[in-house]
Amino acid sequence: MNNISQIRRQLGITQRELAHHIGWGQPRIANYETGLREPSLGVAQKIVQALNALGAQVSIEDVFPFQN
Protein backbone atom coordinates (compact mmCIF):
# COMPACT_ATOMS: atom_id res chain seq x y z
CA MET A 1 0.00 0.00 0.00
CA ASN A 2 1.06 3.62 -0.34
CA ASN A 3 0.72 6.80 1.69
CA ILE A 4 -0.63 9.15 -1.00
CA SER A 5 -3.97 9.66 0.72
CA GLN A 6 -2.46 10.25 4.16
CA ILE A 7 0.07 12.81 2.89
CA ARG A 8 -2.51 14.51 0.68
CA ARG A 9 -4.91 14.87 3.61
CA GLN A 10 -2.12 16.28 5.80
CA LEU A 11 -1.61 18.94 3.13
CA GLY A 12 -5.35 19.66 3.08
CA ILE A 13 -5.70 19.06 -0.66
CA THR A 14 -8.22 17.02 -2.58
CA GLN A 15 -7.60 14.23 -5.05
CA ARG A 16 -8.78 16.63 -7.74
CA GLU A 17 -6.24 19.29 -6.72
CA LEU A 18 -3.38 16.79 -6.73
CA ALA A 19 -4.48 15.36 -10.06
CA HIS A 20 -4.83 18.83 -11.58
CA HIS A 21 -1.30 19.72 -10.50
CA ILE A 22 0.03 16.67 -12.37
CA GLY A 23 -2.31 17.08 -15.35
CA TRP A 24 -4.39 13.97 -14.67
CA GLY A 25 -8.02 13.28 -13.83
CA GLN A 26 -9.15 12.70 -10.23
CA PRO A 27 -10.06 9.02 -10.81
CA ARG A 28 -6.43 8.20 -11.59
CA ILE A 29 -5.32 9.49 -8.17
CA ALA A 30 -8.17 7.57 -6.53
CA ASN A 31 -7.05 4.38 -8.26
CA TYR A 32 -3.47 4.80 -7.03
CA GLU A 33 -4.61 5.62 -3.49
CA THR A 34 -6.82 2.54 -3.24
CA GLY A 35 -4.28 0.23 -4.86
CA LEU A 36 -6.46 -0.43 -7.89
CA ARG A 37 -3.50 0.69 -10.01
CA GLU A 38 0.20 0.29 -9.26
CA PRO A 39 2.33 3.22 -10.39
CA SER A 40 5.46 2.78 -12.46
CA LEU A 41 8.62 4.39 -11.12
CA GLY A 42 8.09 7.41 -13.37
CA VAL A 43 4.50 7.85 -12.21
CA ALA A 44 5.55 7.48 -8.56
CA GLN A 45 8.17 10.19 -9.08
CA LYS A 46 5.55 12.53 -10.59
CA ILE A 47 3.27 12.01 -7.60
CA VAL A 48 6.10 12.69 -5.13
CA GLN A 49 7.18 15.80 -7.06
CA ALA A 50 3.61 17.11 -7.05
CA LEU A 51 3.16 16.46 -3.33
CA ASN A 52 6.41 18.31 -2.62
CA ALA A 53 5.44 21.20 -4.89
CA LEU A 54 2.20 21.46 -2.91
CA GLY A 55 4.00 21.71 0.44
CA ALA A 56 5.07 18.23 1.50
CA GLN A 57 8.66 17.29 2.20
CA VAL A 58 8.62 13.61 1.31
CA SER A 59 10.76 11.10 -0.52
CA ILE A 60 9.59 8.32 -2.79
CA GLU A 61 10.18 5.90 0.12
CA ASP A 62 7.84 7.96 2.34
CA VAL A 63 5.03 7.82 -0.19
CA PHE A 64 5.65 4.30 -1.49
CA PRO A 65 7.26 2.27 1.33
CA PHE A 66 8.98 -0.96 0.40
CA GLN A 67 6.89 -4.04 1.15
CA ASN A 68 7.99 -7.67 1.23
Across the structure, where does each feature detected by a protein language model lie?
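Recognition helix of helix-turn-helix/homeodomain-like DNA-binding domains
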Residues: 24-39
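DNA major-groove recognition helix of helix-turn-helix/homeodomain DNA-binding modules
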Residues: 42-60
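Short amphipathic recognition helices of helix-turn-helix/homeodomain-type DNA-binding modules
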Residues: 58-68
